[in-house]
Amino acid sequence: EIASCLVGSEMCIRDSLRTEHGLDLPRRLQIEFSTIVQRRTDTAGGEVTPAQLWEAFVDEYLPNPDPSKRWGRYGFRGLTQHSEGEGTDRIAVQLRVEDHESTIEGLGNGPLDAFVKALASRGVKVRILDYAEHALSEGDDSLAAAYIEAEIGESIYWGVGIDGSITRASLQALISALNRAARAGIL
């Protein structure tokens, strides 16, 4: 168990998130999150607890289920996916944009590519630069974590998704990146 980390210690931050929450962040996401922790944390004493790290991580990357604390322009409501032959998927994603719900559809080389194309049909241009995923524990009922590095506008944003379905986790990771871009005023 990790008692506290020096602010800015990427290794301690990585180990805390791995030990406490099962997350294995890609290297560039570790670097980005370390910078966020430095920016957000009161550095009196130069240390941050695992609980403070997790709070910062959730606030930055994960949707809050409490509607009064929800941030971000986009929200994931559900999806329907159909395989249409070798390497082609059709996806319909129920999406909240601001306070309006709609369904967007796309066809692509897998569900993530189909979602990117569905977003493009609505004028939201995204380019996936990196993608990683893993199970958070062993067993059939394990949650999956997905990490996406995306170019949105001319900026790079990481997103994180956690779900029982790797497809939903992947789409949520992309929505996380979109919401971070919206928070920064890009969208």
Say what each PLM segment does:
Residues 1-8, 13:
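Single conserved hydrophobic/aromatic residue that forms the stacking wall/gate
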Residues 21-22, 30, 35, 39-187:
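Polyanion-binding surfaces on beta-sheet-dominated domains and ring/shell assemblies
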Residues 17:
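Conserved, mostly hydrophobic/aromatic
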